């Protein structure tokens, strides 16, 4: 795709929007009936009190803080993930879950429902990253050129080199 200067499926010839399909893989958001990012999709009757109904229905909000932090806001919790370099090709992933005090005091609330789901997703993401890293070291791999759209990555790489 990159050799044809396509960085988004929308750029593909013949691409058709699927705006009339509510499946989250096309529209984003949570699966039908889900309230949060958890094993069973349930917020277990514990939602962050300051959220509006619209924010709760949206399901999640994401933010990134360069160079290495990701924040996910959900109806019942917030998850902060930090990627910390621990070597030239190794990182440590730190994940923190923030819950309202009232949620943690609720004896019926099972935070493992949230944590186990996110841990599984992070393990799957880590596996995909490891496969990509292996590919970089394979013999057929040849460095390419960055496209203009990728210069934010180049700026990050330049910043990282200065820090080392």
Where are these predicted regions, by residue range?
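C-terminal catalytic domain of Rieske-type non-heme iron oxygenases
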Residues: 1-164
């Amino acid at each position: 795709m990159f050799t044809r200067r396509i960085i988004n499926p929308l750029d593909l010839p013949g691409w058709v929007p699927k705006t009339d399909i509510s499946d989250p893989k096309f529209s984003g958001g949570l699966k039908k009936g889900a309230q949060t990012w958890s094993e069973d999709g349930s917020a277990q009757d514990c939602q962050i009190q300051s959220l509006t109904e619209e924010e709760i229905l949206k399901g999640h909000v994401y933010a990134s803080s360069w160079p290495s932090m990701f924040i996910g806001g959900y109806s019942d919790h917030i998850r902060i993930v930090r990627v910390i370099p621990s070597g030239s090709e190794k990182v440590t992933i730190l994940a923190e879950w923030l819950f309202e005090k009232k949620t943690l005091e609720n004896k019926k609330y099972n935070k493992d429902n949230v944590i186990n789901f996110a841990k599984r997703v992070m393990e799957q993401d880590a596996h995909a990253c490891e496969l990509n890293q292996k590919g970089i070291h394979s013999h057929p791999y040849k460095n390419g050129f960055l496209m203009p759209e990728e210069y934010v990555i180049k700026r990050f790489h330049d910043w990282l080199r200065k820090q080392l």
